[in-house]
Swiss-Prot record:
Species this chain originates from: Trypanosoma brucei brucei (strain 927/4 GUTat10.1)
SUPFAM superfamilies assigned: DHS-like NAD/FAD-binding domain
Name this protein carries in UniProt: NAD-dependent protein deacylase SIR2rp2
Residue numbers binding Zn(2+): 146, 149, 201, 204
Statement: the UniProt record of this protein carries the keyword Metal-binding: yes
Active site positions, chain numbering: 138
Chief location: mitochondrion
Role, per record: NAD-dependent protein deacylase. Catalyzes the NAD-dependent hydrolysis of acyl groups from lysine residues.
Cofactors (names): Zn(2+)
């Protein structure tokens, strides 16, 4: 499988590749996905959080932040797998030009900082910034923004404040990994929601919101423009670990097709873009695929001597 993708990249000139990643790239880091066998969308009680609901009343915000308080520790501190590390090596080698991701876990940034996760406040920058061509379409769960003054702050700092304000709740309840969502959300009982104490922006007292694109929100226009520019100038577009079900990602595949940019899809099962690609690799492990691609194109094993 890696052989076919490596040949595809060589045929496209070994440069200016644009990558589009989804939740399937992070499952091997312990972050649950949406549409896999145990994915979020297969759970009967799943109801997406929309911006409208989030703003409609304090009870909805209490429910979100209660879930997030218990679920965040699962996605915080996650380490990169060989998908993230392989893509970073391809970027360093000049093969990959831009990396567009639907993921909010910050692991593509972390790859540029060695790939080892940490739950410390100091690790914030490693999950939220890098010079590795990453463009986060849906935001970053490790950041929180104030809806009044616009201040962006570390989610880990908010976790400390939430746990201090809800000390007894934190002692009484522990998140189970099987219930945690890809964005660090966690299903909690109503009694927890009722007891939840919210905290406000430390600068202006405004409402805090996760710095991610909620269901029904639009990807920021500048981000969309940047992504379109990268895709239209690419030698190829490689979609990794994504079923491309949401239009915010699918539109870039359509743009590549319109521009005559060759498309490869590397993921498990069917996608919404099937039939538009030049190459389809069906795999349950994007990490294994990337290990093979790096070995063939760059001549070394991930984690070994370069």
């Amino acid at each position: 499988m890696a052989d076919r993708l490596a040949i595809f990249i060589k045929q496209c000139g070994l440069q200016r590749c644009v990558i589009l990643t989804g939740a399937g790239c992070s499952t091997e880091s312990g972050v649950p996905d949406y549409r896999g066998p145990n994915g979020l969308y297969r759970r009967p009680n799943f109801v997406p959080l929309t911006r409208q609901v989030f703003l409609s009343g304090s009870e909805h915000r209490k429910r979100y932040w209660a879930r997030s308080m218990f679920g965040y520790n699962t996605v915080s501190g996650a380490s990169c797998n060989d998908t993230h590390m392989g893509l970073y090596e391809l970027y360093r080698a000049g093969v990959v030009n831009r990396l567009l991701t639907q993921n909010v876990d910050g692991l593509h940034h972390l790859a540029a900082h060695g790939g080892t996760g940490s739950k410390t406040v100091e690790a914030y920058a490693k999950y939220t910034s890098s010079n590795s061509g990453v463009l986060e379409l849906h935001g970053n769960i490790h950041q929180v923004c104030c809806m009044q003054c616009g201040d962006v702050s570390p989610r880990r700092r908010l976790q400390q404040r939430l746990c201090e304000a809800n000390y007894q709740l934190c002692r009484d309840y522990e998140a189970e990994f099987s219930e945690v969502r890809p964005d660090g959300d966690y299903e909690v009982p109503d009694r927890v929601v009722q007891a939840m104490q919210l905290v406000c922006c430390e600068h202006c007292g405004g409402l805090l919101k996760p710095h991610v694109v909620l269901f029904g929100e639009n990807v920021p226009k500048e981000c969309v423009r940047e992504a379109y520019t990268a895709v239209r100038a690419a030698s190829c577009l490689i979609c990794l670990g994504t079923s491309l079900q949401v239009f915010s990602a699918l539109r870039f595949v359509l743009a590549a097709r319109e521009s005559g940019v060759p498309i490869a899809i590397v993921t498990a099962g069917r996608t919404r873009a099937d039939g538009l690609e030049e190459l389809k690799v069906d795999t349950n492990s994007t990490a294994a695929t990337m290990r093979g691609v790096v070995k063939q194109l760059l001549g070394f094993e991930l984690g070994g001597t370069k």
